[in-house]
Amino acid sequence: MAAQEQKTLKIDVKTPAGKVDGAIELPAELFDVPANIALMHQVVTAQRAAARQGTHSTKTRGEVSGGGRKPYRQKGTGRARQGSTRAPQFTGGGVVHGPKPRDYSQRTPKKMIAAALRGALSDRARNGRIHAITELVEGQNPSTKSARAFLASLTERKQVLVVIGRSDEAGAKSVRNLPGVHILAPDQLNTYDVLRADDVVFSVEALNAYIAANTTTSEEVSA
């Protein structure tokens, strides 16, 4: 059977003025692959676990202060025998099997991380939720009002992931205070943030950087 040809998706590139400035291709190997839900769940779970601080700690009966005295004599009271006021059944006593500081991070292979990200982006692309723009605001002066109006013209959904180049300070300053908008550089793209967002907005610069970094080798993707 002949190998099935991969399709190439095309999306319009929008300007802050609302005009179409050409189109850009989304490679099928990155934006049209099957979404493996179990894989994405595993990667997101590992990513969220790695973000946990893990400094929680409780004291056992040997660590709480006090408790050297026997609360009452062994026999003759009619009550159950007790050896310390810091036993777990007493108020102020130690905690049994309580949490201790630990590392929650899990080892996830880079290929699995990259595959999960491709699946998440493909799901958004197939549903028309990936957008390309020339820039967030015209010129070098930040404008939250202009950026908000521009994003509203692209999508009415609330959670938006904006992927722009690290050098685009005007764009970052324009949207960093907008509710529901999250900003990432192309090398920071991850499965969790893509799935959490309703729409993903790429600048042409960031989209080209992501494609260039992942079409030759799909292993180098940030966790």
From Swiss-Prot:
InterPro entries: Ribosomal_uL4, Ribosomal_uL4-like, Ribosomal_uL4_dom_sf. The keyword RNA-binding applies. The keyword Glycosyltransferase does not apply. One of its GO terms (biological process) is translation. GO terms for cellular component: ribonucleoprotein complex; ribosome. Transmembrane segments: none annotated. GO terms for molecular function: rRNA binding; structural constituent of ribosome. Residues 49-106 are annotated as: Disordered. Keywords: Ribonucleoprotein, Ribosomal protein, RNA-binding, rRNA-binding. One of the primary rRNA binding proteins, this protein initially binds near the 5'-end of the 23S rRNA. It is important during the early stages of 50S assembly. It makes multiple contacts with different domains of the 23S rRNA in the assembled 50S subunit and ribosome. Belongs to the universal ribosomal protein uL4 family. Part of the 50S ribosomal subunit. This is Large ribosomal subunit protein uL4. It comes from Mycobacterium tuberculosis (strain ATCC 25177 / H37Ra). The gene is rplD.
